[in-house]
């Protein structure tokens, strides 16, 4: 669980900014979305392979541009 203590003379905005940064780095939202519903292992592997291919194509296009 992500928690942040407010420091002396620190504004709420700065504290919120620190919280958001910790929240993103911890991957809470990403993990929640990944576990929102069950995906069969075969489908999960297929999706990962297709994402990997797209990422490789984009990287290759950027190198050739």
From Swiss-Prot:
Instruction: State the protein's name.
Output: Small ribosomal subunit protein bS21
Question: What family does this belong to?
Answer: Belongs to the bacterial ribosomal protein bS21 family.
* Region spans: Disordered: 45-65
Any one GO molecular function term: structural constituent of ribosome
Q: Which spans does this entry mark as compositional bias, Basic residues?
A: 48-57
Matching Pfam families: Ribosomal_S21 (PF01165)
Any one of the GO CC terms: ribosome
Record keywords, A-Z: Ribonucleoprotein, Ribosomal protein
What InterPro entries does UniProt report for this protein, alphabetically? Ribosomal_bS21 (IPR001911), Ribosomal_bS21_sf (IPR038380)
Q: Which GO terms describe its biological process?
A: translation
